[in-house]
Regions:
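SAM cofactor-binding core of SAM-dependent methyltransferases
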Residues: 1-70, 83, 117-119
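Conserved acidic-Pro-Pro-aromatic motif
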Residues: 2-8, 17-21, 76-201
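Secondary-structure junction/capping motif
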Residues: 70-76
Length: 201
């Protein structure tokens, strides 16, 4: 839907990031090091990046934090200020746990929430408490195979999709799907098998 605009907040990807990446690949080529074709084709990713954020869509080089202290930081409260009916996607490498309470407070503005939970074996209770507040309802889950599994063969990182039950009707029936779902879920790392999820009552 071209009427939907995307605003991305990411302090790790800027011009310096791309320059550093290209320099590293060029040096590897000059030294005749093995370089995968995908790495060589990364230059097209940069072109796609420029095109994607050319019209309407925005990339703001800011770090998402609980409380703003620096110019390059922004809180969820400020991100959602004057916003409504949004899809919020969060992948901030472990900092998601710091902002869960703010997300719950602003839940009425959010239609759909997609969030990647890192180190879930260390933060299980935080995730459980977030779910128990019932502001959002889980509609999908996928194990991220890039981070691997723990000793119980469970993923260390999961991607969860929530819907706002105040805005959409949801079924009370339990899902009978096997996860990952064929045709819907895709591997984060192609060379590794995807992680089959086990559920317990």
């Amino acid at each position: 839907n071209q009427k939907c605009k995307i605003i991305a907040y990411d302090h790790t990807v800027d011009k310096k990031f791309w320059v550093k990446r290209f320099k590293k690949d060029i040096i590897s080529l000059l030294l005749f090091k093995k370089l995968r074709l995908t790495k060589i084709l990364d230059i097209f990713k940069y072109i796609n990046y420029l095109i994607f954020f050319k019209d309407g869509n925005k990339h703001l080089i800011k770090k998402i934090v609980k409380h703003e202290r620096k110019k390059n930081e922004i809180s969820i409260n400020n991100i959602l200020k004057n916003q409504n009916n949004i899809i919020l996607k969060i992948d901030i490498e472990g900092d998601e746990y710091k902002i869960l309470e703010q997300i719950n407070k602003e839940f009425i503005k959010i239609n759909l929430l997609i969030i990647e939970f890192h180190n879930i074996h260390k933060n299980f209770n935080k995730i459980l408490n977030f779910i128990k507040k019932r502001k959002f309802k889980i509609i999908h889950i996928h194990g991220n195979n890039y981070a691997g599994i723990n000793k119980h063969n469970d993923p260390k990182v999961v991607e969860m999709t929530f819907i706002n039950p105040k805005k959409f009707k949801t079924s009370k029936n339990k899902s009978n799907f096997n996860y990952p779902i064929i045709g819907l879920d895709y591997k984060n790392l192609k060379r590794r098998p995807d992680i089959k999820l086990k559920f317990h009552e």
